[in-house]
Amino acid sequence: MGLMLLCSMMGPGCLGPEWPEALDPLNGSDGIVCHGMAEYCLRSYDNFTFPETHNSYATIEDDVWMAMNHYTGLQAQWEGGIRAYMLDTHHLTKEDTNVEDVRFCHGDPDSTFLHPCIYSEVDAYAWLRLLGSLMNNSSGDVVSLLLENYVPGEHLEVLFNQTGMLDRVFVHQPGHPWPSIGDMVLNGTDLVVYWDYQYDERYPWLHHAWTHSWDTPYGEQEQSEMSCRVGRGDGVQPVWHLNNWLSSVFGFADPVRAGQVNDYDTLLERALRCWEEVGDRPTFIAVDYWEDGEVTNVTITLNKMSHWSGEVPAHP
């Protein structure tokens, strides 16, 4: 079945302006694959589910031992199928606030406790360069970043420019439909960046997270407290984050119960329930300790489904 026939079945807007007229993603000789499947190139960005790591850089491999969220770093996360990352941008200290001092650190810089970069400093430039290298060697994957930001926008622009990531960012206009994954790949705009800071017209590529998307509450202490309710944002946008991690009584990520909430059957049931309740599939499923449980397998299953009520495919 050719691309044009597929699009006639899927409705207007399927064939974006970036598709060469004769390109058929289902024809192996055309050589375009998106997230491992040619047909996913036809999916719009908001009609796909991406596995996401919370505080992606806060790992033992990155020498973060206090307030860590995962055991393994970016390389392992990428190889495990993670394609969306939550990052916290800070300056190195309250005195070291130049553009070269931008780091990924976990914590509140206004805390009366230690500055977060004292106990969890990760080189943001090196981290993003590695991500860019991984993306360059991938086969049609779109990546998303959600920044909890504590530095000026101009410092982020330098960071993304010097690491080569600014050249590949996609800019979304609020209220406009999201493009297909294939369009984004072919157009070289395979990176979407959100930040939880207010909109700044100087940086249209830094999408205000809670204007362009929304999320569920996060950091509950009990699994029974997890819900599909709106946490931040309006609950109307088709792009949304299903936050799926528990916090300990001290407010840190809970490694003991991560495997419980990331369990395949448990997480799949929650995702399908929220899909039904919300009306849109979760765009992102965000977890702590991604190594425990099967978040990537859950997203593989969800992406094989066109509706929450459909037949659930076999376990990957």
Tell where the protein language model's regions lie, with residue ranges:
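Catalytic cores of phosphodiester-bond hydrolases, prominently lipid phosphodiesterases
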Residues: 19-316
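Secretory targeting signatures
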Residues: 1-22
